[in-house]
């Protein structure tokens, strides 16, 4: 076995960015079949983070089709989401399938699958339950290269958030309330992405309302009293509104004109 770390760090120095680059590329090097090929890979390694990210994303895209799509979708969400997401929220968002009226939990990718498909670009937090990009420089790279990496991210995030709230679970309307709000809490446990979707769907559609795939969903949602009322109830509950404003009758009092505004 050749000594990878001394060769690489000897060439680049013990700088934080070099260490990050090293960690991203080490996996591909140690998977080479022979010491000679490992040395060849080492010689051709990019000497900066931009090159390291390009190499890593190329490896993600070379995965089998569904795994490559999963890896890129994870990066898209973590780069462009309006707030940090929990692993459960992200997995639930990734499981959403347009055109299906019910929620299918069997499509949720596991944390281990997400990490495997992202080749070290994302990390989970054991303390908070959040999943994030592994380094701020990854965020900077993804944001600066979004036209090539995620050309339709706004439509994808908007259609996922709005479409998710049109699932049968939410179209049946807001939950009844009681002292401890157990039914609302259960809904949020069973549908982890509901919180994010309820809070941010309107932000994501701001720039894409006229898009072909967004228009029909948006029009349907405006006239779906149950779905909109469910979203309103979730938002109000999580913001700590008084029970009178979380009551399903109050949430259902919104008219299509309210929903369109």
Task: Give residue spans per PLM region.
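Hydrophobic repeat-domain scaffold segments
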Residues: 155-261
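P-loop NTPase nucleotide-binding module
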Residues: 1-145, 152-180, 189-200, 252
